[in-house]
Amino acid sequence: SMEILKDASSTAIYGSRGANGVILITTKKGAVGKTKVSYNGYYSINSVAAYPDRMNLSEWADFKREAYRTDGQWGGPEDDAKIFGSAYDAVKSNQNVDWVDMLMQTGSQMSHSVNISNGTEKTTFNLAFEYMSEDGLVKMDDMDRYNATLSLSHKLTDNLKLNANVVYTYLDQNIRRDPFNRSIYYAPYGDVYNEDGSINVLPFNDGQTISPIAEEVPGAYKNNRLTSHLVGNVGATWNIIKDLTLTSTFGFDKKDIRTGHFADTYTLDGAGNYSLADATNHSDVNWSWENTLAYSFTLGKHNLSLMAGNALYKNVAEEYKGAGHNLISSTMLFYNLGGLQDSQQISSSYVQTTMASFFGRINYKFNEKYLMTVTLRQDGSSVLAKDHQWGVFPSVALAWRMNEENFLKNVEQLSNLKLRLSYGISGNSAVSAYQTQGGLGKTMYAYLINNTENGAYGYYPALTPNYNLGWEKTATANIGIDFGFFNNRISGSLDIYQQKTSDLLMQKKVPSSTGYSLAWDNVGKTENKGVELVINTQNFNQKDFSWNTDYTFTLNREKITELADGTDRDISNGWFVGHSIKTHYGLEKIGIWQLDEAAEAAKYGEKPGRIKIKDQNKDGSIDNDNDRIILGSETPDFVMGLNNTFKYKNFDLRVFMYWRQGQMLHSEANGYGSYRIQGDPGIKVNYWTPENPTNEFPRPEKSYSDSSKLDALGYVDGSYLKIKEITLGYQLPKSWIGKIHASNIRIYCSLKNFFTFSHLDNYDPERGGSLSYPMTKQAVFGINVDF
């Protein structure tokens, strides 16, 4: 089970690690009684949720002809040979190839897990095993995962209890390089296979363009990642005397990742120039030791709980990497880097970070009606500058159970009414180590001696030092109310909050004259304020039929209130005072110049068919300095969730819907680079021609090159409504399953991510505008068995 903590008071005790909220995960534990065994398994069929259509060969041919016609270089079929060159024969024969489709496959996922638990009065345990395998949507993407979990608790004496939790995961992944950023823009033709059926790595007549499926040639490509991850903790709880408890927990988290990558000469990575291989070993070790002393007592109507503690955290990350070009034999893959003949590179790194914390909490209750919590925590982080490493973070919360008051106690319709107030300060030090110290990077330079090219390494300033880097601090005020009516058939909560963050930790662009590009800094202040509403209703609750609804609504308004150096804008980073951090700033497209607007278009140096940009300052010209505006934000106006659960006899149905409204995306499918206005192949769009005077996309034009105006095509409304999941289940009757001594068997099927409603055609806006790996939809079939 999971519990999400968000307000300042409940997260304050977790310090900087809870700066963005806390998710409490309660894992399964053993219980006293007979052994319980459960099995859960499922199989899913995965496919692409949505992906933009590409131009087929005839559509691309028309598109390219139009681009040349606009420039007066195409007047009819007699000019085809001139403009298509080596593609002319394919265009004549309509030899169509969809390269993106060639990469894809129907994916699948399979999981089997077994859980065993038991316990005595002194010892309980829970043991779980899981195996999961997956074949991705892209060929050569696959994964196998093995997982084992042990939870153990032992009562050593009447007042001393020991516990241990261990999770081990082993992951074997084959990961194909993202081929979409190339295949989308390939001309939709080519000789995909040789006469013998093997893959043709040079499918075009130019002798240099590598096939996007060249990696599928046996032995030509391998990108494998092995992950071994061990997480555990051991702890003891000692009831020293009545109401006084000492708890000590030691945690350990070790992750080892080995990544090996090989690409032969004729692959997308090799690009026809050389084979390449690299191998990386990365180790990440986290240690923690947490100790708390808690005391509580009750005196009459008063209850007081006190807690004090400290925690130590340490992280050590090591990495070793070797790489180079031109293996003696491709069969070596990445297992024998000594066989690399050129551009050999060896690198290593060691990163250590530490944190120390001291904290305390007071909980006070009077008559179970009036509650107060006060928390104080001090964190020290090694990643910050020497004189700024320690931060103090207090919080206070008050609550009033109003339904316990005499004037409300007899209101039968009221089940719960609790008013909450909280205020607290949290800290964030989430930056990489050594940002305060600066550092050098290494690169290879070529030089000539006796007309022979040689290589030598040079060093350059790669990391900007910041000797004043300190804590990012967020002050959060929250007022909330928990409510329940009609014996909690209607229940929920309403929260109104305001967060003010100062000394924001962000990377900012710095002038190139400094020799650097980016630097971490405390750059300014932001404010978030909003409303969160949760409503749970039991609509029907009869013997054979029930219907429950869970509704969530979130509204957040984010803005920058101050930037470094007192400026109101930082255009290079896209930051503007009074607006969201994730703001889109650019030229505003208001349509396409039409034929009857030729005279007006000419005033701006344009002509019908080109993008019409709004002249913001009405000076008669379009330029980046005066006509770019804030177009929108990636932060939505609101987010809603609606979950309905129906049960009829042994059947259950769950439908979960998700609505994200008012966000702007910069879509790679629409913007400069994807819309190849000069006639190159790409995404299929509705473009302007004299015969098709649309306002969506401009006319193809061979000589057009104004990228800032083309970039305006990419800003789109990213609002969407999704039916995220539909699950239908059936619980087998007890009379059926008793013969195999099972206590419960449930079979189910789910549709995940199947239905999306948005303004975007053939694109899932949850992907955020990117054209890389597409979103997945799943048809899942599963079974749960308990013995």
Q: Positions of the model-derived regions?
A:
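Extracytoplasmic gating/loop element in the C-terminal half of outer-membrane beta-barrel translocons
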Residues: 86-90, 381, 660-747, 751
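Periplasmic plug
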Residues: 1-8, 40-42, 46, 126-128, ...
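Residues embedded in well-ordered regular secondary structure
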Residues: 21, 29-139, 177-179, 215-224, ...
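N-terminal plug
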Residues: 1, 8-17, 47-51, 450-452, ...
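Non-catalytic regulatory/gating segments with a bias toward low-complexity or hydrophobic composition
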Residues: 2-3, 23-25
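Short beta-strands and strand-coil junctions in structured, solvent-facing domains, enriched
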Residues: 8-13, 30-33, 45-48, 122, ...
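Extracellular/periplasmic, surface-exposed regions of secreted and cell-surface proteins
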Residues: 110, 145, 151-160, 165-170, ...
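Conserved small-residue
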Residues: 38-91, 321, 435, 521, ...
